Structure formats: C-alpha cells, structure tokens
Amino acid sequence: MYIKQVIIQGFRSYRDQTIVDPFSSKHNVIVGRNGSGKSNFFYAIQFVLSDEFSHLRPEQRLALLHEGTGPRVISAFVEIIFDNSDNRLPIDKEEVSLRRVIGAKKDQYFLDKKMVTKNDVMNLLESAGFSRSNPYYIVKQGKINQMATAPDSQRLKLLREVAGTRVYDERKEESISLMKETEGKREKINELLKYIEERLHTLEEEKEELAQYQKWDKMRRALEYTIYNQELNETRAKLDELSAKRETSGEKSRQLRDAQQDARDKMEDIERQVRELKTKISAMKEEKEQLSAERQEQIKQRTKLELKAKDLQDELAGNSEQRKRLLKERQKLLEKIEEKQKELAETEPKFNSVKEKEERGIARLAQATQERTDLYAKQGRGSQFTSKEERDKWIKKELKSLDQAINDKKRQIAAIHKDLEDTEANKEKNLEQYNKLDQDLNEVKARVEELDRKYYEVKNKKDELQSERNYLWREENAEQQALAAKREDLEKKQQLLRAATGKAILNGIDSINKVLEHFRRKGINQHVQNGYHGIVMNNFECEPAFYTCVEVTAGNRLFYHIVDSDEVSTKILMEFNKMNLPGEVTFLPLNKLDVRDTAYPETNDAIPMISKLRYNPRFDKAFKHVFGKTLICRSMEVSTQLARAFTMDCITLEGDQVSHRGALTGGYYDTRKSRLELQKDVRKAEEELGELEAKLNENLRRNIERINNEIDQLMNQMQQIETQQRKFKASRDSILSEMKMLKEKRQQSEKTFMPKQRSLQSLEASLHAMESTRESLKAELGTDLLSQLSLEDQKRVDALNDEIRQLQQENRQLLNERIKLEGIITRVETYLNENLRKRLDQVEQELNELRETEGGTVLTATTSELEAINKRVKDTMARSEDLDNSIDKTEAGIKELQKSMERWKNMEKEHMDAINHDTKELEKMTNRQGMLLKKKEECMKKIRELGSLPQEAFEKYQTLSLKQLFRKLEQCNTELKKYSHVNKKALDQFVNFSEQKEKLIKRQEELDRGYKSIMELMNVLELRKYEAIQLTFKQVSKNFSEVFQKLVPGGKATLVMKKGDVEGSQSQDEGEGSGESERGSGSQSSVPSVDQFTGVGIRVSFTGKQGEMREMQQLSGGQKSLVALALIFAIQKCDPAPFYLFDEIDQALDAQHRKAVSDMIMELAVHAQFITTTFRPELLESADKFYGVKFRNKVSHIDVITAEMAKDFVEDDTTHG
C-alpha cells in the first residue's frame, strides 16, 4: 500500500484544483524554493491522515483556506488516492480514495465518495498499520532539530508513546475511578445495615400486640364481606331484571328503526325519481327551446327562399320577353346590315373604277409634267453650263442621286406591299382565332352550368346532414343532463362516504391514486401498478345483514391498502413522499403477512366472520389478518362465553363486541351511516355513470363525429366547386375579353388598309416620274450643249402642254366624282361599324347572358331547397308537439310521486314519535340501571378494600341476618378500639427490613469481590505497561545501534534508561535498568512500577572507541541532527508504516551524512514509500521520481520534473541560496 495520487483544491497556497501526477511506490523527492508550498503539500497529507487536525475551530478551518487575489475560497478539500493492491486496507478495491472537505461551517470525510466519520477513518488507518502512538511516519520541518535538543524525559515520553502505554494509563484511570465509586457504595451499605439492625429490634416488641389486633380485624372483615356480598347479590338481581326489560325494549326499538329506515329509503328513492323526472323535464324544455329557435331560423330561411324563388321566376319571365325583343332587334339589325352591305357593294366598284382612273390620270399627269420639266431644264442647261463636259458631269451626279432615290422608293413600295400582305394574313388568322374562342366559350358556359347544378345538390345534402346533427345535438344534451344528474348523485354519495370516513384516510386513498396515475403516465414501475389491489373494502362482498358487524370488526382497516409485497408499498411511499402528497396510508403486503389457520368452535350459536365474506382467494392472507379471528355470535352472552373459552373476538349482528382480552364495546349503531352500504351505493353509481358515459360516447358522439366528418367533406366539395366555378367564370371572362380584342384588331386593320393602298399608289407614281427623269437625263448625256430646244423637243413640249391641260381637267372631274363616292362609302361604313354592328354585338352579348340563366338551374336548386326546409319545419313542429305531451305526462308522474312522498313522510314521523317515546322509557331504565351499577361498584369496591380473606370467612356468617351481622360488627369495632395505638404495619415492616438486610449483605459481598478484581486489574495493567516499555526500549535500542552504524560507519551508539533511585550522574543501559527496576520495586510490591524511569539518554561515538562515548549535549549541531535521524529510523523500524513523509530532514547534515541518510532511505524504500523534500543533491540520487513546486501569483503549483531539472534547481538554489 502506498500513496498513489494527491488532489488539492483551495487548501493554503493551492487555490485551483491541483492533481499531482501519480507517485512512485519507492522514493519521491519534492524540490522548490522556500515559501513555494512544499510544506503546505505535506500539511495537506497530514490534514487528511493525522490527529493533529482532528478538532478544528471555525477560525482554524478558515485559516486553512486559500487566501489570495481573485474571489474568496469558501471551501477546500484534499483527496489522497491509495494503491491498495496488497489489500492492506480492508476494502476489496485496488484503489481507495480518502477525501477531507472543510469550510467555515463544515468538516467532512469521504471514503470512495461516501461520507464517513472521523472515527471510521482513524480505525481504517489503524487497521492498515498507522499507529496513533507512533506519529513519526510524518516528520515535519524542524522536528529533527526538536528531537536533537530534547531532554531525556522527553525521549522517555516518546518511548512510552511508541510502546503504547497510553492505553494502559487510560484503563488504569478508569479502574481508579471505579474503585473510588465502589468504596463509597461500601460505606453507604454499612450505614444502612446499622440502621436496619436497630429498627428490627424495635419491631420485635410490637409484634405481640399486633397478633391480638389481627384476630379481631379478621373477624370484622369477614362480617363486612358478608354484609356487602348480600347487598351485591340483591343489586345484581335487580340489574338482571332491568336488562331483560331493556332487551325487550331494544328489540322493539330496532323494529321501529327498521320501519323508519324503510320509510326513509322509500323517500330517498322517490326523491331520486323526482330528481330524474325534473332533470328529464328540464332537458325536454331545453330541447323545446332549441326546437323553437330552430323553427324560427327555418321559417326565416323558408321566407328567404320563397322570395328568392319568386324573384327568379319573375326574372325568368322577364328574360323570355327580353329575349324575344332582342332576337327581333337582331333580325332587323341583320337586315339593315345586309342592306347597307349591298349598297356598299354597289358603290365600291364605281368608287374603285373612278379611283383607278384618277390614279392613272394623276400618274400620267405627273409623268407628263416631269417630262416637260425635264425638257425645260434641258433648255436651261445651255445657259446654266458653259461646256458639255460640265453639264455631263452634273447629269452624272444627278443620275447618281436619282438612282439612290429610286432605290429608296422601291424599298418603301416593297415594305408597304409586305405590310399589306401581312395584314391580309393576320386578318385570316384573327378570324380563325375568333371562331376557336367562340367554341371554347360555349364549352365553358356548359361547364359552369354543370357546376352550378352540382353545387346545389351538395348544398342540399349538407343542409339535410346539419338538420340530422341538430337532432343528435339535442339528444346529446338530454343525455348530458342525465349524466350530470347521475354525477351529482355520485358526488353526494361520495360526500356521505367522506363524512363517515376520516379526512386523512380519504386523502391517502386519493394520493395513492395520484401516484399510480403518475406511474401510468410516465410508463414506469409496471410491477408496482400490477401489485396494487386497492383498499380492503373494495375487494370483498357480503350480505347487507352482516354490514354492521363486519364494519365494527374492521374499523379503519377497511381502508388498508392490499399490495403484493413490501417492495411495492415502499416504491409507492417513496413517490408519495417525493410528491409531498397529503393523507395517511396503511399497507397489507401479502408476502409479509404471517397468518395461521384458526380452529373455530363447532357450535350453532356462532359462525366465523370470514366465511360470510366473498373475495378473491389470492387475498386470503389479508382477509384472514383482518377478520380471521372474529366470530359472529347469536347474542352477547354467547359472545362472552366463546371469547373467554377460545380467546377469539366475538361480535353480534348489531355490532356489540367482546374482545378476547375481556373488553366489551357496543351500543346503538346508526346503519344509515354504514360505510359498506355507502361504498356499495358509490360503486353502483359509478357503474351506472360509466354505462351512461359509454352509451354517450359509443352512440351519440360517434354519430355526431361521423356527421361532422361528412359535413366537413361536403363543405370541402362545395369549396372545390366554388373554386372551379371561379376558375371557369374567370376563363369565360378571359375568352370574351380576347374575342373583343381580336374584333377590335380586325377593325383597326381594315381602317389602315385603304390609306396604305393609297400611299402605295402615290409612291408608285412618284417612282415612274423619277424613272422618266432618269431616262431623260441618260438620253441627254453625251449630246451637244444647246441654248435652245430642238424642233422635235419644242413640238414635244407643246404636245405635253396640251396633254397636261387636258389631264388636269379630267382629274378635277374624277376627283369630284371620287369624293362624292368616297363620302357615300364612308357614311355607309360608319353607320355599319359604329352603329349597326356595335349594336348587334351588344344584342348578342345580352342574348348570351340571358342564355346563361335561361336553363333555370338556380331556380331548380332553390325550389329543392325550399321543399327540404318545409319538411324540416314540419318535423320540428311534430317533435315539439311530442315534447309537450311528454312534459305533461312527466309532470303528472311527479305529482303522483309527491303524493306518495307525503304518505311516506307521515309514516316516518309516526315511527319517529314511537322511537322517541321508547327512548324516554329507555332513559328511565338507563338511569335506574346506572344507580344500581353504581351501588354494585361500591359494594365490589368495599369487598376489594377488605383485602384477602380466609376461606372460612366466605361461609361462616352466611346464615346470619343483616341485623345479627351488624350487631357482631359493632362488638368487633369495640374490641379493635383497644388496639388503636398498635403499629398495624409492624409485621410487614419487620419482614421488609429483614429482606432489605439480606439484599444489602449480598450487595456488600459483591462490592468486596469487585474491589478485589479492580486491584488485581490495576496490578496486571502496571505489569504489562512495564513489560511493553522494556520490550520497546530493547527493540528501539537495538535498531538505534544498527541504524547509527549504517549512517556512521565505524561509529557506535547506545540508548541508556535512567531511573529515579539512581543519582543523576549514574546511568545504566537497558539490561542493567531492568534489573534495578525489579530490585527497587521488590521492597514495596511484587509488581514493578514504570514511575522509576526518569528518562532515556543517548551515548554515541563517531570514531567507534569506547572511551570517546559522549552525551547529546557534547555533540555539534550536525551530529545531533544525525543522531536524531537515527533515533527516528530506529522507531520506524520498530513500528513500520506503509509510507513516510520527510520534510527537509537533511537540512543540518553535512554532505557525507546526507549521503548516508540517502542510502538508508534507498534501503528502506524497498518495503515502504518515501516522499521527501530537500535542498541538497544527495537525496536526489536515491529518488525514483521528482516533483517541482512553483509559486506564481500567490498560488502554488506542483508538477513532475526530470532528475536533471531537480539537480539543476538544487544546485542553483545552493548557489544563490
């Protein structure tokens, strides 16, 4: 076993949690500067293991907590982990952790994370070899110097500690204390014996007179007994007579109470029936109100539908007339359009012919004009240009410009041609699209009509289901009211049961149910749920005739909880307390009940109570435990006899009870408050309530849920249809919008077609003129430059002038004619497009709209809905009439029940009056019985006061009359007066004092024997203490010599025991001392005393020569330290520990001796662990592991370091120390 690891937090200079790397099982060296925390590390281990820190005051605990920068430390702990692979600690683990935690108000030990006491820790350490008498397995800083300078007496004290004499001293002190106490008791007993002897002498003289007194007193008591006994017998006879009368009266009272209870039961039954009928009436009236509200709503809906149907019929009638009018108007419009189109067809050829002529004339006029202009220009170029070349140059330039202009004109003409062709193609495409859209429009209209029809079908079905649901809701409401009434009835019965049972018990039952519900909800402890079987009362049945006796027998045990095992009850109670639930509970664990079979008496006057109970055989133990030792008897007399004979509890059917111990209990028991009856009623009401709830859930609510689901489905269908309707109507509007747009496009295209044609003709005429000019210029190119036209050209000019004038005149005539025809065409087209055709479109649209409603879909749906609402109104009125009839019949039934209630009330009152009269008579008898019982008690008391009497006293005076008895009694009293001064207790006192004397003598002998035993024990303890010191001295002395020779080769050292009877200059070794001790003590006692020893001296020689042996005072400081170390090693060899902690033990040694100490530690480290601190390099050589302690920011840290780092630190510290 050794220290494997140390964990420190908050202790002295170690603030943060410091986990020291595991130690070697041999030699570990810790190095560090002064004040870095090495000693605090040793203090931490000592804090856990040593007695030095056992009883710390609060201020001492605070002093051990770390103080530094940062937040204040409020608690600290030191944990030591031991390697226990050798099982030196009696714990079956290879690693054992021991932790001590302190704070301002706490000081706790934890062994393997479990809290233990300080004594447990100390006992555990002692079992592992840590002796309280030898604390030298931890050697603190300065301890070596302290031992080196200690006097001889101090070393003797140390030797006594190592020898363990403290135990002997403690036992000796206890023995001395016990001996003093025994001596005091012996003196007291002697005083008492002296007093008793004197008192016995006095009582001997009083005994003679007492004998005469006792003779007459015996006679007096016999006479008084006879008188009292006669009075007692007379009183008993009268009591028996009264008991017989009371029994007869009690039977009559029972009959009257039974009759009264029957009347009350009938009244309660009638009240229940009246409540149920009133609840039924209330439900019917509420249903009637609901029906009335429904009927009002239905009538309102019917009125709306009737108005809507009428409006639709009127609308359809008006639509028919309008359609005829529109068709007639459309026909007229078509005729007018045809007429105008015919007129247009006649005018357009004329217009086109005139226009064509005009265009040809304009083109010819432009050509002739251009040709003339060219000829004039040709004439002018003679004066314009000076030479032919200049003119040709200009013509070429002009031709180039003309070619470009002609090309531009051709492109424009080609573009207009293409535009006209595209317009014609678009016109055809537009027409195709328009026809397609018209076809789609008809399909969409048909689909909208179909959706309208489907929508109204679904709506009608939904309305029918809603009507059915309303009926079911009314039914559910009626059932809910019946359920509420039944629940109210159950609550009343539960309240009665609560009133008859203790609040704590009922709270306990409720709390147990909460615990089980918690388990069920969490899905845990299934075996606990299965192992709980409810209270006793819920687990059996019996005939009502036995309710009273069963209930009286069980009492509150009726509410004990049956469980399979004590484990189940423990689990329930743990959760019960964890949830802080109220109430009290008592469990009957079947596995713990010890029930034995009972031998019941074979008699016709009694039966075992358990035979009249019906229960699950599984719970036989529980019921035998509660009822197994009880008999149901015919009468109280039988109960008394059987209880005495068979030591069993007996009870009558009326609840009068006789305990096997002799106690009698009984009296009137109110059966109306029977808890078994109440529990039966509660259970029955719960079953009825469960049936009603099941019916409500299985039938009505399931149907309502089904209808709700169907209505939701229909509502979803209606929403889907509405969505589709909106979609198709939007599609229809979109198609109409597209058709309108196409029509407008076509009209716009027709409007732009004619201007484009005219523009084309103008461009073509201009192109001809430009081509003519180009040809003229080309012809002129290369000709001679002339200032005058040639004759041919002049003729051509004249001819052109004539042609131009003629063409202008023709063109004016054609223009006038074209304008006239164009005006006619424009007027006709405008009338067609802006008037006739536009109106025709409007008429067509109105006809289409009329066609949408013309099918009567809405009217058909409205008519169907109206028929359905009429049927619902009729059904509602029929149901309302049925409810009126039912209400009348139910109210009549209530009146009959109320009459019956009055009759039963009168009967109950008659029985009550009879019971009251009987009760008064019974009270009189009870008062008389009470007086007789009092007299009986007085007689019995006086007889008891007479004390024990001889047998002759019971028979001697039985034949005498009361008069004679009183006469003899008077004579006895006269004689007794003569002995009034006699000590009547003289004989008793004499016997009593004699007995006390014997007891005291025995006690005195016991004390004498005890005193002798204590003296013997003290002698044995003194001898053992002497032997222990002698043995320890020999072992330590031997070890000291051996260790010193190893530390100082060639040296010699001995220990010397010093004694009190020897002069201070005289000292002897262990052997001589032993002989002197025995001789010195032999003159006084056979037991040698350790008090003769005064000290332990040390004599050493560092050279080995006998003549150079010196005392400790004669040695240098380093030699003293070495000797002290040798003594410590010797003590440790005598009482070895599993590990040792040395704090700077080599401080005062020179290098040679430090090396010897290091070698010694290396030798001892084979069998024990060493943890040492040093500032010298010698101890490092024998070490197996090295640790360095650093102090940063007022906090210590300890880490594993290498041997080289440890040597460097020691050398550096030695250099700069």
UniProtKB/Swiss-Prot annotation:
Q: Where is this region: Disordered?
A: 242-268, 1059-1090
**Where would one find coiled-coil regions in this protein?**
179-350, 393-503, 669-916, 958-989
Protein's recorded name: Structural maintenance of chromosomes protein 3
Q: What is the lineage of its organism?
A: Eukaryota, Metazoa, Chordata, Craniata, Vertebrata
Q: Which family does it belong to?
A: Belongs to the SMC family. SMC3 subfamily.
The listed locations are: Nucleus; Chromosome; Chromosome, Centromere
Alphabetized Gene3D superfamilies for the sequence: 1.10.287.1490, 1.20.1060.20, 3.30.70.1620, P-loop containing nucleotide triphosphate hydrolases (3.40.50.300)
SMC hinge domain sequence ranges: 530-642
Q: Which residues carry this modification: Phosphoserine?
A: S787, S886, S1013, S1065, S1067, S1074, S1083
Is Ubl conjugation included in the keywords of this UniProt record?
A: yes
Physiological role: Central component of cohesin, a complex required for chromosome cohesion during the cell cycle. The cohesin complex may form a large proteinaceous ring within which sister chromatids can be trapped. At anaphase, the complex is cleaved and dissociates from chromatin, allowing sister chromatids to segregate. Cohesion is coupled to DNA replication and is involved in DNA repair. The cohesin complex also plays an important role in spindle pole assembly during mitosis and in chromosomes movement.
Q: How is it modified after translation?
A: Phosphorylated at Ser-1083 in a SPO11-dependent manner.
Q: Locate the Phosphothreonine modifications and list their residues.
A: T783
Subunit composition?
Forms a heterodimer with SMC1A or SMC1B in cohesin complexes. Cohesin complexes are composed of the SMC1 (SMC1A or SMC1B) and SMC3 heterodimer attached via their SMC hinge domain, RAD21 which link them, and one STAG protein (STAG1, STAG2 or STAG3), which interacts with RAD21. Also found in meiosis-specific cohesin complexes. Found in a complex with SMC1A, CDCA5 and RAD21, PDS5A/SCC-112 and PDS5B/APRIN. Interacts with PDS5A and WAPL; regulated by SMC3 acetylation.
- GO annotations of cellular component type: chromatin; chromosome, centromeric region; cohesin complex; lateral element; meiotic cohesin complex; mitotic cohesin complex; mitotic spindle pole; nuclear matrix
Q: Which Pfam families match?
A: SMC_hinge (PF06470), SMC_N (PF02463)
GO terms of biological process kind: cell division; DNA repair; meiotic cell cycle; mitotic spindle assembly; regulation of DNA replication; sister chromatid cohesion; stem cell population maintenance
Q: What is known of its domains?
A: The flexible SMC hinge domain, which separates the large intramolecular coiled coil regions, allows the heterotypic interaction with the corresponding domain of SMC1A or SMC1B, forming a V-shaped heterodimer. The two heads of the heterodimer are then connected by different ends of the cleavable RAD21 protein, forming a ring structure.
Which parts of the sequence carry N6-acetyllysine? K105, K106, K140, K1190
Where is this protein chiefly located? nucleus
> Which tissues does it occur in?
Spermatocytes (at protein level). Widely expressed, with higher expression in testis and brain.
Please list the residues that bind ATP.
G32, R33, N34, G35, S36, G37, K38, S39
**One Gene Ontology term of the molecular function aspect:** ATP binding
* UniProtKB keywords: Acetylation, ATP-binding, Cell cycle, Cell division, Centromere, Chromosome, Coiled coil, DNA damage, DNA repair, Meiosis, Mitosis, Nucleotide-binding, Nucleus, Phosphoprotein, Ubl conjugation
